[in-house]
Every structure is written in C-alpha cells, then in structure tokens.
C-alpha cells in the first residue's frame, strides 16, 4: 500500500509538471472539478461551484443507460435517466428504430426514514429529510454519495449501472445507519409498465417495466445497511419475468469492467494519461450489443445502436480491438467486416455507409463518403495486428474489393474521388478530399504487407506498393498547399481555410509537410479549448480529428509538443466539466460520449506513443516516442499478433532508449537512438 501511495504521489507531481508545461505552451489553464482516486476511479466532491450538470452513458449487451445529473446550490441531486433497448425495435426499420424511455426523479417510489419522506431533488415538506450529495464517483458504475438526517447520521449510496447481458438497468439505494439508535427504512412497492403498439412493433409488442426490488419496511440497527432498488427493463414476455438480483447484476458489471481493464495496461509517469486510457478502454469496449446479427459495436449517444458505420466501427474502433485482449471486442470487429462484406457486388456499387436495425437494413444517405477506403484501412490494420491467418483470409476479399472500388474512382489528377467525407456534408469536402486519400494510401500499404503474409502473388502486392507510392506523390501535388501562411494541406481542391483533417497525412505516415502542419494544428486558428476546430474560425469541433492529430504528431516525432497537448486534452475530458470520456462533437449532439472515439484515444498510445505499426502476423515496426522528461513508459499485457507481451521503453545515456519486449519467459532488449525504429518479431 505504501508503494502504491508513493507511485500515485510521484505521478501526481509529474502530472503537475505536465500541466505547467502545457500552460507555457499557450494552453488554457484548467480548473479541475474531478480528482483521480487510488482505485482508478474519479470523484467529484461537491464544492461551492454549484449548480453543475453533466451527463454520461453506460452500456451492456442489451441496454444503454444515459444519465443526466445535476447538483443544485443546496446539494440536492436531480437525475434524468434514459434507458435504451437496442434490440427492441419498432417499424419501419431505420437507424433510430430502437425503443427508449426516460424516467424522472418524480416517478420514483417514495422512500421513508423513520416515517419521514426522503427528498431526493427538492427541499419541500415540513419535517421531512433531504438527501444532500457530498460526492459523485465514476468507474463504470455511477455512485452519488450523500447524507441525510439532522446530524448526517444516515449515509446513502445511490448507484446506477447497466446489466452486462440483460435488457435491464438498475438504480440502487444503499442506506446505512451510522447513528447510535435504530432506524426504520421503507420504500413503496411499485410496478409500472407500458407496451408498444402491436402494429408498429417489430417481432412482437415490447413492454418496458419500472419496478422495485426489496421494497417494504426494514429495521436497521446501528452500523447496518439495506439496499433498495429500482429496475428498468424491457421484455416481450411480461408474464414470464425472472426475478431481478441487483447485487448479482452489480457484481457482474464490476467483473466486466475489470475484465476490460486487465489487458493492455498503460504505465507512464502521467497519472492523467494512465487513467483516461483506462476509462477510454471501458467506453470503447462496453458499447457492444448482442444482436440477432451477432455482436455489433455501436456509437450510442441515444441515437446509434445495433448498427455499424464504416468510419466509427470499421475505421476507428475495430483496429483497436486487435490489441485490446477483449474477446467480445474481437468478435464485434470480425462481425463488422463480415456485415460490410455482404454488400460487395460485381458492379462495384458502393457499400453503404451504415448497416442498421440489427443488420436488417442500411443507410447511405450521404452517398459514398469514402467508405471503401475506411473499410479497407481498418480491416487490413485489424487483420495484421490480430495475427490470425484464418481471420485474415476471411477479410482479404473485402479488403481487395474495397481497394479495387477506390482504384476505379481515381481521377485524372490521380486522387480518389467521393461524394462526401465522414462529416456527410456538414462542411465542404469537394470532389476529392484529403481524408479519403490518406486512408486509401494506408490501406494499400497494409494490404501489401498482409498479402505477403497470405502468400498472395508478388505481382498483386507489388502493385499495391506501386499504387501507394503514386498516390503519396499525388497527395502532395493535389493537396499540398500554403494556407494562412502554413505549409500544409488544403482539404479539397478549392479549399482556402485551415481544416482539422490536415492531420491525416501524419497519422498515415506521410511526413512531407510535417513542420507546417504541426504549426497549423496547434495555432490559435485551429486549436481551441476543446481541441481542434473543424474549420478555422468556427466553433464546431469533433473529437475524432483531435484524436487523429495527437496520434499523428507523435508519429511525426514532435513528442514533447504532442504530450503537452495530449495531457491538456486528457485533463479536460477526464477531470473537467464534462467527464470522463472523449466525446463526439459540439454543438451537434452536445458532446455525446460516442464510444468509437474512445477507441481512437487508445490508439494514440498504441500507434502514436509506442509507435506500433503492424508489418506481419507476428511482427511490427516499433518507433517509440519517449518524452524528454520521462525516464520510462510501458504498455503491458498487449494482446496482439497472436501473442501476449509487454513493451517497456526506458531512457539510456547518450540520447538512446531501450526497447524491451517481454513475452512469457522470454525477453529481448533493443537499444536504439531516439526516433529510430525497431523491427520486432515475436
């Protein structure tokens, strides 16, 4: 325990130093609301900065729980919980045809303590008692910890969490008698249900139920506790309900979170980076829904469930699952690519951008967004890093089909054209955009490496390498430009304002315009308090571009600058006003905790900081970027390339670093100059 405290103390000092450096770099000062706890959770001790509101999403295989919570100036909480049931669908099929119901505090059954009504969200009622929230804790389960009674002798832990594998969310009140006399606690028995219209319900009418568990009267002696629960569930068979066991559901949720956190552990001197990495792993991995079409990773955000997108799932998060060590994550990745592959066709019509409603229909409302480049990029990266030849063979036809589709859309200027990009017309993208072309470039590079592993004829793999080289030259010629004085890229042919996606060449290993691009990214024209503006001068931001940029700047070797901005961004997302995960966008969606962005956050470390670039089923190039003020860093329990191994980086004398690879009882240490690449074979 003493060792753990010393480690936490050391990390806190280094984090403080990083904060000071960030302020010197021109980043805004942050006034953190939350603090990291020794068990890896974060806590907010309610202070005088009230009122405050925030929202968070938590997911299981059959449910997603979105909670908006606020604390008023008197310390009382106000909660709104929306429960989404992804596999309970209405007709007609579309992206948002799942059912979801919102429950407010005034719909809860009343709780009494010694015959006095416990007020959760308002201070009315003479002689009644109020639940004053003292702190809120997040770590896969949300806890609101408060006190009630004149001397605060009654403590109440109000926790909310989703079931791991059932269409069920639970709100649990654990009431403890800390006084010297017995108390009597009672909760009203309640069971309310609504049933959807049969004519518009898919498969069967759906029933949503709010019911109590362990209601009634309980006598608590000093030191004793009781748990009272409210359950929110969906069923197509309301007459055949099984009893709900809140304790078992909570235990399962804790175990699932621990299972997600166990592999792929980041160790750096910066406790904020370590903790946000762990939180991002939770959000990226929990948001996988068990559908009739198999496991489907879904973005969430009250809108996107039991559905996959070429960008969110195929491009952003599935390549992360190849490193994650999570079996469900891997299944969701393979299923994602399988579902997209089902839309391949001999006419080379585009694969739809999104497959929705448990795989029953699709959405392609924005036309070709460069989706084939997204899919080929993600699938080839995943196949190499996962390291299983049978899986790669299944993905190869999809990869080659998407590459051929893109080749057929090469323009006279030798760049790939598309109808739009992943922003689907929200901002102009021209006839050919930088993102699609960079993704296609990396896909060609990875496909050449993958094809060699699959013993594809050299004529084909050499052709991919040649096409990649030609495309790289075309990207420089077509997109290379001086914008606002920065030698960087234009996003499309007639673009003359800086765009966030100028980071894409760096993230894909194209470093021709590194200096000017990094200067532009971190200039006041693009960098805002919340990361990169989508376009210079606009308030709109999408975290995905910031996450790509931070990875790309690390890959380009501007390590200390990248770490300053990564520390700033991570602090804001983990400990600031809206926590604890990366978000989708603002103002659209009001910074929803869409889950694939958390996968992108983790990839900043696997591909950026540790510089892992898959080259084969059991090999990778490693170009670690150890910050100048760190002595060491490690990524332990990496599950990739068909192996489990640790990657430990440490500073040596003479500007060199040691790269230690530990696999089982074997280990090998490479000593290289900082910035050099190690070719690792496991």
Description of each model-found segment:
Residues 2, 22-275, 558, 562, ...:
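Terminal accessory carbohydrate-recognition/targeting modules of carbohydrate-active enzymes
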Residues 219-246, 302-307, 352-374, 404-469, ...:
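The feature captures the catalytic groove of carbohydrate-active enzymes
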Residues 258-393, 420-423, 494-507, 521-522, ...:
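Substrate-binding groove/exosite segments of carbohydrate-active enzymes
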Residues 277, 281-284, 461-479, 569:
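Short amphipathic alpha-helical coiled-coil/interface segments
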Residues 288-291, 344-349, 407-417, 477-484, ...:
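Proline-centered turn/helix-capping motifs that create local helix->coil transitions or kinks
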Residues 309-324, 329-338, 393, 397-400, ...:
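Active-site core of glycosidic bond-cleaving carbohydrate-active enzymes
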């Amino acid at each position: 325990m003493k060792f753990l405290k010393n480690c936490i103390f050391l990390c806190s000092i280094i984090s403080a130093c990083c904060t000071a450096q960030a302020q010197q770099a021109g980043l805004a000062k942050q006034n953190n609301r939350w603090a990291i706890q020794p068990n890896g959770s974060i806590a907010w001790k309610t202070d005088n900065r009230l009122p405050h509101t925030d929202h968070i999403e938590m997911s299981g295989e059959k449910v997603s729980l979105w909670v908006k919570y606020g604390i008023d100036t008197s310390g009382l909480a106000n909660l709104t919980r929306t429960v989404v049931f992804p596999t309970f669908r209405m007709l007609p099929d579309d992206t948002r045809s799942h059912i979801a119901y919102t429950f407010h505090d005034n719909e809860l059954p009343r709780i009494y303590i010694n015959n006095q009504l416990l007020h959760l969200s308002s201070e009315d009622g003479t002689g009644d008692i109020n639940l004053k929230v003292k702190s809120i804790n997040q770590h896969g389960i949300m806890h609101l910890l408060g006190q009630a009674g004149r001397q605060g002798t009654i403590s109440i832990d109000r926790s909310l969490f989703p079931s791991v594998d059932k269409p069920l969310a639970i709100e649990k009140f654990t009431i403890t008698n800390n006084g010297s006399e017995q108390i009597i606690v009672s909760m009203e028995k309640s069971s309310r249900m609504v049933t959807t219209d049969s004519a518009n319900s898919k498969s069967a009418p759906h029933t949503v139920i709010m019911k109590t568990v362990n209601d009634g009267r309980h006598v608590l002696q000093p030191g004793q506790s009781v748990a009272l629960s409210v359950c929110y569930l969906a069923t197509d068979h309301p007459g055949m309900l099984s009893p709900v066991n809140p304790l078992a559901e909570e235990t399962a949720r804790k175990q699932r979170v621990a299972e997600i956190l166990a592999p792929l552990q980041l160790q750096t001197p910066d406790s904020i980076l370590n903790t946000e990495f762990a939180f991002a792993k939770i959000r990226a991995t929990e948001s996988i829904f068990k559908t009739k079409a198999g496991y489907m990773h879904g973005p969430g955000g009250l809108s996107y469930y039991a559905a996959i997108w070429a960008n969110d799932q195929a491009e952003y998060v599935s390549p992360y699952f190849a490193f994650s060590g999570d079996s469900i994550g891997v299944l969701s990745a393979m299923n994602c690519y399988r579902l997209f592959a089902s839309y391949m066709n001999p006419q080379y019509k585009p694969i739809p951008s999104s497959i929705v409603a448990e795989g029953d229909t699709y959405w392609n409302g924005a036309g070709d967004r460069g989706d084939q480049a997204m899919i080929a990029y993600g699938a080839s990266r995943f196949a190499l890093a996962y390291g299983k030849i049978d899986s790669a063979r299944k993905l190869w036809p999809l990869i080659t089909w998407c590459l051929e589709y893109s080749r057929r859309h090469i323009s006279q200027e030798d760049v790939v054209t598309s109808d739009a990009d992943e922003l689907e017309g929200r901002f102009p993208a021209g006839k050919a955009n930088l993102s699609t072309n960079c993704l296609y470039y990396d896909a060609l590079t990875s496909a050449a490496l993958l094809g060699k592993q699959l013993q594809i004829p050299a004529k084909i793999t050499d052709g991919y390498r040649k096409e990649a080289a030609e495309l790289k030259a075309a990207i420089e010629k077509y997109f290379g430009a001086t914008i606002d004085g920065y030698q960087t890229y234009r996003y499309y042919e007639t673009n003359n304002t800086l765009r966030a996606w100028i980071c894409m060449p760096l993230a894909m290993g194209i470093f021709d315009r590194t200096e000017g691009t990094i200067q532009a990214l971190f200039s006041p024209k693009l960098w805002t308090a919340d990361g990169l503006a989508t376009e210079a001068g606009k308030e709109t931001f999408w975290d995905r571009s910031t996450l790509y940029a931070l990875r790309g700047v690390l890959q380009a070797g501007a390590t200390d600058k990248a770490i300053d901005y990564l520390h700033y961004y991570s602090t804001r997302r983990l400990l600031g006003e809206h926590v604890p995960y990366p978000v989708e966008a603002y103002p659209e969606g009001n910074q929803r905790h869409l889950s694939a962005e958390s996968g992108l956050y983790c990839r900043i470390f696997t591909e950026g900081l540790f510089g892992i670039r898959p080259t084969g089923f059991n090999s990778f190039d490693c170009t670690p970027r150890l910050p100048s003020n760190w002595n060491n860093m490690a990524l332990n329990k990496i599950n990739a390339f068909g192996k489990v191994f640790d990657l430990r980086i440490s500073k040596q004398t003479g500007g060199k670093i040691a790269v230690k690879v530990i696999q089982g009882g074997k280990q090998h240490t490479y000593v290289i100059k900082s910035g050099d690449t190690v070719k690792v074979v496991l």
